[in-house]
Design a protein with these regions (language model features):
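Beta-barrel outer-membrane channel/assembly domains of diderm bacteria
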Residues: 16-138, 163
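Repeated loop/turn-to-beta-strand initiation elements of outer-membrane beta-barrel proteins
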Residues: 35, 73-77, 128-132, 168-172, ...
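Outer-membrane beta-barrel domain signature
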Residues: 47-55, 105-113, 144-150, 190-198, ...
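Outer-membrane beta-barrel translocator domains and adjoining extracellular loop/strand segments
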Residues: 48-53, 90-95, 142-151, 182-190, ...
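Feature captures outer-membrane beta-barrel proteins of Gram-negative bacteria and organelles
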Residues: 62-69, 120-126, 157-166, 194-213, ...
Length: 245
C-alpha cells in the first residue's frame, strides 16, 4: 500500500509539473536531462568457514537512469527515474543461501531467475538549495551511505534537502523512511544487525565546511528511532602529491 501510494503521488506530481511548463521551461527540463544505461556482470563466491553452505552465483545486472533538468522560474522542478533488472545466470542447488545480499530468493529458498524494480524521485530547486523526495535516494554521507558492493544498488526512500547558500558550506538534512536492499525488489524498515523489528524514521542533519581547498570539517547528527542517536565529527585533508615530492 505504501509503495502504491508513493507511485501515485509521484505520477501526479510529474503530470502537474508537465502541464504547467512553458516552452523555455521545457527546454531546460529536457535539454539538461541525462539518460544512461549501466551494466554489471558479477560472480559471487563466498567460502563459508563458519559451517553454513558456500555461495557461488553468477548474475547480470542492468540499471537505467533518467535524470531531468529543472524547469525555469524562482523554483525549478524536476524528476529522476530509475529501473533495475537482474538476471540469474548460474548457481546450482545448495549454492544459494535463502538469506543473502546478492540475489533474491523464491519461497522454496532457490534463487529468482529474474527480478526487477523501478522508482522515482521528484525534486525542486530554489537558489542554491535542492529538495528531493522519492525512493531512489542514494546518500553518500558520513552517517548514511548507499551500498553499491553487489549486483544492484541499495536505495532509500524519504526526503533530503541540500543547501549551498553560504560559500564553502554545504548543509544537508532529511528523513529516511525505508530501504530497498541489494538483493530485494521491496522496501523495508530500517534496522541494525540482529534486531527483530524496524524503524521508519532515520533523521539527520549536518554540514561540510570547506576551510580551504585541502581541508574540510564535518559535523552530523543522526537518530534512528527506537535504536540509536549519533554525533559525527570529521576532518578531511587532501595532501597533494607532486613530482617534486
Amino acid at each position: 500500500m505504501h509503495s502504491k501510494s508513493l507511485s501515485a503521488t509521484l505520477a501526479l506530481t510529474s503530470l502537474t509539473v508537465g502541464l504547467g511548463l512553458t516552452s523555455t521551461a521545457r527546454a531546460d527540463f529536457i535539454e539538461d536531462s541525462k539518460l544512461s544505461l549501466g551494466m554489471r556482470n558479477f560472480f559471487f563466491n563466498a567460502d563459508n568457514h563458519s559451517g553454513g553452505a558456500d555461495q557461488k552465483e553468477w548474475a547480470q545486472g542492468f540499471k537505467l537512469d533518467y535524470i531531468s533538468g529543472f524547469t525555469e522560474g524562482t523554483v525549478g522542478f524536476g524528476v529522476d527515474l530509475e529501473g533495475m533488472l537482474g538476471l540469474h545466470l548460474d548457481g546450482g542447488k545448495g549454492m544459494h543461501p535463502a538469506i543473502n545480499t546478492f540475489t533474491p530468493s523464491k519461497s522454496d529458498g532457490s534463487a529468482e531467475s529474474t527480478w526487477a524494480s523501478a522508482g522515482a524521485t521528484v525534486k525542486a530547486r530554489f537558489s542554491k538549495s535542492e529538495i528531493r523526495y522519492g525512493n531512489t535516494l542514494t546518500p553518500n554521507l558520513p552517517i548514511l551511505v548507499a551500498n553499491d558492493g553487489r549486483l544492484q544498488l541499495q536505495t532509500f526512500e524519504g526526503g533530503m534537502i541540500t543547501s549551498k547558500e553560504i560559500d564553502n558550506l554545504t548543509l544537508t538534512g532529511g528523513q529516511i523512511e525505508s530501504v530497498k536492499g541489494r538483493a530485494s525488489t521491496n522496501s523495508t524498515g530500517l534496522s541494525v544487525s540482529g534486531a527483530t523489528h524496524g524503524s521508519n524514521k532515520f533523521r539527520f542533519a549536518g554540514g561540510d565546511w570547506k576551510v580551504n581547498k585541502d581541508l574540510t570539517l564535518q559535523y552530523y547528527y543522526a537518530n534512528l528511532e527506537n535504536f540509536y542517536s549519533q554525533n559525527f565529527l570529521g576532518l578531511v585533508h587532501v595532501l597533494p602529491i607532486t613530482n617534486d615530492s
